[in-house]
Each structure stands twice: as C-alpha cells, then as structure tokens.
C-alpha cells in the first residue's frame, strides 16, 4: 500500500498592512513563513493608509514568493496548490495578493484556492494542534469580533458579531488618545497588567440573550473620561485607564463566549485574530473554561503569538481543508473586500 502523498500549498496574504507568503505541508506544518511588515510606514498616520499599503505589497510580493520557496527548499513542481486571501480586507491590498496568486497559477498550471481571511485566522489553531469538531472560535481583530461555530473544517457559522466597532479597532482608537503608537494592543495589554480597574467602564450587551458585541459605547466613555480630565487639568493614571478599558472588553468577550460554549458544547475552543495575542484575554478564557464541569470543558487551542497577526501560514492551513474538499477557484477569482462567513459549503461530511 503506497504512502499518502504530502500536500504542499504556497499561500499569499495581503488583506491589510502585512505582505506574507508561506509554504504549508499537509495543513499542519510550516515549512516557510515570510512576513514583510509595514507598521513603521503607517505609524505616523495613526493607522493603515490603504494606498500606502497597496504600494508596499507591490514592492515586495515577488521577492517574498521566492523567499518562501527557498526557505522551504521547494521548487514549483513540489507545490500542489496556490492559496490566496481574497477577502475581507482593503480592496487595493487584496488585489495585489490575488493578482500574484492568479499569475503564478496561470504560469505554472498549479490549482488556485481562494481563502476567506477570517477562516484563515481561525485555522491558525490547526498549525498548533488538531481541531476536534464541532468547535467554537472567538475571532477578535481590528476589523472583526465574532463567535463562530465550526461544524467541520470548511463549514463555519457566525453566531455572534459586533454591531459597530471591533475590539481591536477600539484598542487602537483609545491608544491614540493615550499617545500610544499604532498598533496599540500590545502596549495597552502591558499597561493593563500594571493598573487596576478603577473607572468602571460600561460592559455593553453583557446580559443580552444573543452573542453580539458592541464596543462603540465603551470607546466613547473612555474618550469622554480622558477629555473631561483634560478640561479640569486632572492627570489620570494611564495604567488604571488601560486596566479599566481592557477589563470591560474582556468581561464581555469571556462572558458571551463561555455562554456559547455551554449552549453548543464544542469539542474544541479556538481563539484567532490579532487580539488573540492579548495575554489578559488568553489567561481569562483559559481560567473560565477551567471552571466548567470537567465533562463540559472543550480542548483549548490558542495559536502561537506570531500566528495571531496577519500571515500566510494560516491561509495555507485553511486552504488545505478546502483542497481536501475539492474547493478550487478559477482565474476569474477577484478580491471581495466585504466577504463574509459562511461562504464555503461543507464537502467533508
């Protein structure tokens, strides 16, 4: 009996301000991962400038394609599929990755796979450990805050979503008020561990029956508190401000996610997205799950910190599942900045 052939996927990610390529073997093993970051180019603007991001993607995408293949010690004949993020994200940024992947696919004849960016973030967990289904994912980033039910590797259902600002967006906006460079999440998290929750900021929708979120009221309360203090020349403790803000965010995220776990009884709990690197959130979710009855505790997979931000490895991991389900794209694939889950029908049942 012949051994099962290894599947290698060359993946592209360019949905925002990171240009990344990777070679992933069998959906689990990172043979190479290249990330060309643009953070310094955007810091002076306090956030991502779409036109600047697109120009940077153009400058590096060819070079990092070569680097990914070289680092993996691969040639084109070793690659079984080309994967690319085609949404959601910044349309100009997405187009660079999609165009590069389509060009490679057309030139080499290697099949093309379009991957949802959010599916990628969730599947970063697959690079750390095997996911047992059904699973619940808490996806928290600058653009999205969602609770997602995974019925299998390609069938995702959003059961909770943000009504306004995503959690990561709120971090960056309050970071600007505190004079923290973009992206602000890491600094706010560090400050929060040095302060106390003294400001009692609102926990919006905490007791609502659904699993949706709202962070615009928290953001406004934070900004108003700081502006009022400025007007009366009162100096506020930045560590306490950070701790109070983070406590409000984490309370809501943890409360709703644990309630979803109790209702859906998943075999695995996953976190994904940039805010999944937040140590306060990681600790809180692990603690809350440990409080559940032993029989109700799902397996917990928290992705490695380097895989919480945008990267092509997670896209390659997600693409492997689509590859196994025969879900390929053709050369009409286009960027879809408003792409939403669930978009892929399960073919693995």
Swiss-Prot record:
The keyword Zinc-finger does not apply. Binds 1 Fe(2+) ion per subunit. It is found in: Cytoplasm. Its main location: cytoplasm. Its cofactor is Fe(2+). Pfam families: TsaD. This is tRNA N6-adenosine threonylcarbamoyltransferase. It comes from Lactobacillus acidophilus (strain ATCC 700396 / NCK56 / N2 / NCFM). The gene is tsaD.
